[in-house]
Amino acid sequence: MNIQDMILTLQKHWSNEGCVLMQAYDTEKGAGTMSPYTFLRSIGPEPWKVAYVEPSRRPADGRYGENPNRLYQHHQFQVIIKPSPDNIQELYLESLKALGIDPLKHDIRFVEDNWENPSLGCAGLGWEVWLDGMEITQFTYFQQVGGLECKPVSVEITYGIERLASYIQDKENVFDLEWTDGFTVRDLFLMAEYEHSVYTFETSNTDMLFELFTTYEKEAHSQMDKGLVHPAYDYVLKCSHTFNLLDAKGAISVTERTGYIGRVRQLARKVAKTYYEEREKLGFPMLKEEAASHE
C-alpha cells in the first residue's frame, strides 16, 4: 500500500467514526499537536472530533537528505476525539486492520510513554504503540493544554506516516517509499530536504532570526490583548519555529534555551486562557449544538 492510499484509508476510517477531515494548517510547526485543530480545540468543554495530515518540521533532524531515517520534515496523521470514547483502543486497532495489519498476526504493544511539551505547557498520559518492535503511533490522553486542565479529556492518536509506510512497504530507506504510482518520497521531498538542511545549518541569518522571534512575540501579545486568539496563536507558532531554527544552528546557549522555551510557554498559556475566555463569552456554542443533535 502506498502512502497516498494509506492516508485515504485512515481518512475513511476516522471519517466513518464521525471525525471532521481537516487540511493541514498553513503555518510551520514541529508536530501535529501544535495545530490549532488540536491545541485550541482541546481546551474547554466543547466536543470535538478531527483527523488531518500534518507536515511537521524539525530543523535539528535535517540531514541533507543523506540519512535513510531522519527528516527535516515528516508527516503525521493526527486524530483528536473529545471526550475520549471508551473503545478508542479498539477503534485504533481497527484502523491498523484497514491498513492490512492484522493485530492477531503481529506483536502490537502499548509501551507507557507519558508525554510532555514544555514549550506549549502541555502534558498527558500516553503510550507508544510498537508494531513488531518499531514505534508507529503515539497515543495520548491530554491532561493539560496551555497550562489549563483538560475537562473533558481529549485523546490524541498520532501515526508516523513515513515510519508506518516503511513497515507496510518493507523499505529501509524513507526516500524509497512509494507515495503514489510513479512517485517516491525522494521524487517529492529530497530537494527540499537538502535545501532546508543547508539553510538550517549553514546559511540562515541568526541575527535576523533573533529579531523575528522578538517581533513575533510582541505581535502575539498585542493580538491577545485585543482578544484575537487565532492571529495570536499563529505568531506563537512562528516563535516556536524560529526558536527551533536558532536552536538547530547552535545559536542559543544552554542557559538561554530555558529562557526562550519559557517565553514560548508564557505565550501559549496566554493563548489558551484567552481562547477559553472567548469561547465562554460565546456560551460554548458547540455544547448547544451537541445537545440539540441528541434531542
UniProtKB/Swiss-Prot annotation:
Might you give the EC number(s) for this enzyme? Answer: 6.1.1.14
> Keywords for this entry?
Aminoacyl-tRNA synthetase, ATP-binding, Cytoplasm, Ligase, Nucleotide-binding, Protein biosynthesis
The record lists the membrane-crossing segments as none
Could you tell me where this protein is found in the cell?
Cytoplasm
What's the domain of life for this entry?
A: Bacteria
- UniProt catalytic activity: tRNA(Gly) + glycine + ATP = glycyl-tRNA(Gly) + AMP + diphosphate
A biological-process GO annotation: glycyl-tRNA aminoacylation
A single GO molecular function term of this UniProt record: transferase activity
InterPro entries the record matches: aa-tRNA-synth_II/BPL/LPL (IPR045864), Gly-tRNA-synth_heterodimer (IPR006194), Gly-tRNA_ligase_asu (IPR002310)
Q: Which GO terms describe its cellular component?
A: cytosol
Report the enzyme's class at the first EC level: ligase
UniProt cross-references to SUPFAM superfamilies, sorted A to Z: Class II aaRS and biotin synthetases
Family recorded in the similarity comment: Belongs to the class-II aminoacyl-tRNA synthetase family.
Q: How does it assemble?
A: Tetramer of two alpha and two beta subunits.
Please give the name of this protein: Glycine--tRNA ligase alpha subunit
| Record organism | Bacillus pumilus (strain SAFR-032)
